[in-house]
Amino acid sequence: MKSVIVTTSWDDGHVLDERLAALLSTYEISGTFYIAPHNREFGKQSLLSGERVRALSRRFEIGAHTMTHPRLPRVRDEEARKEIIDSKNYLETLLDKPVVSFCYPGGAHTEALKQMVHEAGFRMARTVERGRMDRGVDNFAVPTTIHAYQHWSDIPQHFRSFDSSTMKRIFNWDVAAREVFDRCLTEGGVFHLWGHSWEIDENQDWGRLEMLLAHIARRENVTYRTNGELV
């Protein structure tokens, strides 16, 4: 039997992460929530408070996502390093336990940034690379399988390998995700679902997400892990 690992990760620290966490708990699926405590893209009322992050950490892994969510390659090295280190220190003080996982805002990273994350004491860093069924060879550029979002740019890669009826189905990200998961069951590998709770809400995709979670949950010979447990 080939090894199959399922992991999920959710970015930004939005208050809707609590709704997402409840769904994951219902289906007994592991998850890592990447928190940017002062995320500049949202008002304070839209972000999880420290107390709510602590509550989330009792069931799920908490990872760092910088303090304010800048695109790190666009800022000076000193600012990038401070964002990375401060986010780790903030969360470790808040949670009173090690924070080993990091996620680059927008997935944007460079070799220099990977080195900064490593030097800050993280064990791994997740990107937003999609379409992979493995954990990658670089712990500081970990890829994903599918984003819980409709990326039309993902569709052309399937044009030559699927007939028109299949193409109609995979236009839905959740249907594509189920097909990729089923392939993973056959071939082995890592199925890594990621997304944003606020994005799922904006797109009214809670039903789709729940159907996908029900499909991948409680499978024999499947190991459910946090991102930090991948490395």
Regions found by a protein language model. Name each.
Residues 77-82, 167-174, 178, 203-206, ...:
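Non-membrane alpha-helical structural segments and their capping/turn regions in soluble enzymes
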Residues 145-180, 185:
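A conserved mid-domain beta-alpha-beta active-site/ligand-binding segment of alpha/beta enzyme cores
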Residues 27-115, 119, 123, 131-159, ...:
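Metal-dependent polysaccharide deacetylase catalytic core of the NodB/CE4 family, i.e.
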